[in-house]
């Protein structure tokens, strides 16, 4: 069903299916993508992971290695009952203030609704990055400051 803005609803089985659509390969603390089109599927906060954090390929806040020139399709799922989150991409790195006040370089997800009634919110966007170092962050006050961010390397 539709939610505010770009957010849609998914059931837990739908969320599990979405998580399988990430096209990266995980090794250590890095998820590496290849090809002309890549699909990054990030979640916050999956069971068993510390709050607040992002998970990609069952890794906590991994570095994402993405080829320059690729089209990046991002799916962000909020599985964290009781809290909203966002997935935004910026050039500014840590440390992040309690009020991050960052300028996203692409229209990200905005703030997610809080999951309820067994439904989880997800949002999707497409990014065409140039080579460089970026960061994915949650803009909910205090979240990036306490570790809810990761690095993206495009080369």
Swiss-Prot record:
It is found in: Periplasm. SUPFAM superfamilies: Cupredoxins. Cu cation binds at residues 85, 138, 143, 148. Pfam families: Copper-bind. The keyword Metal-binding applies. GO terms for cellular component: periplasmic space. PROSITE patterns: COPPER_BLUE, MULTICOPPER_OXIDASE1. Its cofactor is Cu cation. CDD domains: Rusticyanin. The keyword Metal-binding applies. Keywords: Copper, Electron transport, Metal-binding, Periplasm, Transport. NCBIfam families: rusti_cyanin. This is Rusticyanin.
